[in-house]
Amino acid sequence: MHCDALLKLYETQGKIQFKEAIELETNMERLKKGKVKVQAFAVFIYPEIKAEQKFQVALDQIHYFYTDVLGNNPNMKLIKEWTDIETLQEDEIGALLTLEGVDAIGNDIKKFSILYQLGVRSVGLTWNNANLAADGAQEKRGAGLTSFGEEIVAFNNEHKMFTDVSHLCEKAFWDVMNVAKYPIASHSNSRAIM
């Protein structure tokens, strides 16, 4: 469900194309061959990017989502509503824009709203590290959801967006499960099978 194609397109500044770039683990040709019906495209910001640059890096990746992934592949269709999946034609593939870690927005819910307006419909609060929303799986402190994280989940609930529990520490996972109406685990493992 999850792929890092947008990060690679951003890193190469558009020198590779989503349609058939062999450098991408996920490209249009591979999606067709695998008969994939919906693909999630993650916007990811490396932790070492300066705080004041993170939102712009997110916007740049979204630019490649619209100009290359959707713009150069007419059979890719933007998924903004649940019904968009149901109305996909046989030869179409849905493209779901996601955010992996909310570091790009700092503590500004208005920036989060802008990302929603640009098409983001699934949000992972962290990427292994701690941020202003929650602690990630590699944060030794293991604290849960912050009040800002609760605000993000409330926004997700109101707008029928997925809250992705991938990369969260255990306490943050359970905090999200207690308040999220639309939780998912897009790329996670279970601790046990019962």
Provide a role label for each language-model segment:
Residues I109-Q117, E139-I184:
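Histidine/acidic residue-rich metal-binding segments in metalloenzymes
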Residues H2, H167, H187:
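Histidine-centered active-site/metal-ligand motif
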Residues V102-G106, M161-L168, S190-M194:
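Active-site glycine- and acidic-residue-rich loops that bind
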Residues K181-Y182, H187-I193:
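Acidic, glycine-rich loop-and-beta core segments that form the ion-binding/anion-interacting portion
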